[in-house]
Amino acid sequence: MITKEEAQKIAKLARLKFEEDTVEKFSAQLSTIMNMIDILNEIDCKDIEPLTSVSNMNVRMREDVVTSSDLSNKLFDNVSGNSAQLAKEVKYFITPKVIE
């Protein structure tokens, strides 16, 4: 069981501030979490191989090939409307004002 003082110390280390009644609730919640951890620590996992992937499939990796990465011209070809030419020149998307 985590005491009220221990809960206050943990809260201070985490830079949290609690009201007096909230510290007791925090203490109870931490105690519950620590009890769950104790239960997990009791499980014997010595003969269990660690799971590294949920899929047993072999993932084919593609070769790392350097290609031209300047796609801005293609991207700005899709811009339409009155501001299309300006957007292509400055390479920014021009949108209507959203926030006043």
Curated annotation (Swiss-Prot):
Keyword Transmembrane: no
InterPro entries xref list: Asp/Glu-ADT_sf_sub_c (IPR036113), GatC (IPR003837)
Reactions performed catalytically: L-glutamyl-tRNA(Gln) + L-glutamine + ATP + H2O = L-glutaminyl-tRNA(Gln) + L-glutamate + ADP + phosphate + H(+); L-aspartyl-tRNA(Asn) + L-glutamine + ATP + H2O = L-asparaginyl-tRNA(Asn) + L-glutamate + ADP + phosphate + 2 H(+)
EC category: ligase
This protein's UniProt keywords: ATP-binding, Ligase, Nucleotide-binding, Protein biosynthesis
Quaternary state and interactors: Heterotrimer of A, B and C subunits.
Family per record: Belongs to the GatC family.
Keyword Signal: no
Organism: Rickettsia felis (strain ATCC VR-1525 / URRWXCal2)
SUPFAM superfamilies attached to this UniProt entry: Glu-tRNAGln amidotransferase C subunit
Enzyme nomenclature, EC number: 6.3.5.-
UniProt GO BP: glutaminyl-tRNAGln biosynthesis via transamidation; regulation of translational fidelity; translation
Molecular function GO terms recorded: asparaginyl-tRNA synthase (glutamine-hydrolyzing) activity; ATP binding; glutaminyl-tRNA synthase (glutamine-hydrolyzing) activity
Name the UniProt record assigns to this protein: Aspartyl/glutamyl-tRNA(Asn/Gln) amidotransferase subunit C
Record function comment: Allows the formation of correctly charged Asn-tRNA(Asn) or Gln-tRNA(Gln) through the transamidation of misacylated Asp-tRNA(Asn) or Glu-tRNA(Gln) in organisms which lack either or both of asparaginyl-tRNA or glutaminyl-tRNA synthetases. The reaction takes place in the presence of glutamine and ATP through an activated phospho-Asp-tRNA(Asn) or phospho-Glu-tRNA(Gln).
Matching Pfam families: GatC (PF02686)
